A protein has these predicted regions:
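Phosphate/pyrophosphate-binding loop motifs in nucleotide- or prenyl diphosphate-using proteins
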Residues: 1-191
Length: 191
C-alpha cells in the first residue's frame, strides 16, 4: 500500500524526476510524457464517471479501468530489467483480454455502425468520447517512448491503451443507446 505523508519533495525543481526504480531522468523524457498522458486519461474517465450519469454496468468497468491505468503508469515509470530487486507491477495479457471481453459484451448490444459518429449526444457519451481521444494520445506517447526506450519498456502498455480507446468508443455509444448515435453527415449531404 502507498503511504504518502507529504506531496511536495522539491526533488523535481530542476527539471528531473524519479522513475519507479528511483533512477533520475528529465521531465521531458518520453516515458514521463507517456505516463502523464495515461494519468490525464484516468482523470478524463473520472470526470465521465462523476458527471456523465452513466449506466451502473459502464461505471463498474470504468472504475476497474481507472485502477488498471494506475498499473499502466506504474509499469511505464519502472524500467524493465533482468532480476529486479523487487518485482515491479507489469501489465500482462489478461489486462488486454478483459478489455476485449468488455468490448465484445457491450458492442453486442449496439446497432451496427453505418457511418462515422460525432462526439456528442448525452453528457456521458460526450465525456467518454473525450476520454477516448486522451487515451489515444496516451497510446501514441507510449509508442513514441517505446521507439526510444523499447529495451526497458513493456509493449503491452501500448496494446492496453489501444484496446482501451476501442472500449471507450463502444461505451460512448452505449451511453447514447437511448437517444441514438450522432452520425456524421458528409459535406455534400449537409446542404
Amino acid at each position: 500500500m502507498v503511504n504518502l505523508t507529504r506531496i511536495y519533495t522539491r526533488t523535481g525543481d530542476k527539471g528531473t524526476t524519479a522513475l519507479g526504480d528511483m533512477s533520475r531522468t528529465a521531465k521531458t523524457d518520453l516515458r514521463i510524457s507517456a505516463y502523464a498522458d495515461a494519468n490525464e486519461a484516468n482523470a478524463a474517465i473520472g470526470t465521465a464517471i462523476a458527471l456523465g450519469s452513466l449506466p451502473e454496468d459502464v461505471v463498474k468497468v470504468l472504475v476497474r479501468v481507472q485502477n488498471d491505468l494506475f498499473d499502466v503508469g506504474a509499469d511505464l515509470c519502472t524500467p524493465v530489467v533482468e532480476n529486479p530487486e523487487y518485482p515491479p507491477l507489469r501489465v500482462e495479457q489478461f489486462y488486454v483480454d478483459k478489455l476485449e471481453a468488455d468490448c465484445d459484451r457491450f458492442n453486442a448490444e449496439l446497432e451496427k455502425l453505418r457511418s462515422f459518429i460525432l462526439p456528442g449526444g448525452t453528457p456521458g457519451a460526450a465525456l467518454l468520447h473525450q476520454a477516448c481521444t486522451v487515451v489515444r494520445r496516451a497510446e501514441r506517447s507510449t509508442w513514441a517512448a517505446l521507439e526510444v526506450h523499447g529495451e526497458v519498456m513493456n509493449p503491452l502498455t501500448a496494446t492496453y491503451l489501444n484496446r482501451l480507446s476501442d472500449l471507450l468508443f463502444i461505451l460512448a455509444r452505449t451511453a447514447n443507446k437511448e437517444i441514438g448515435d450522432v452520425l456524421w453527415v458528409p459535406g455534400g449531404e449537409r446542404g
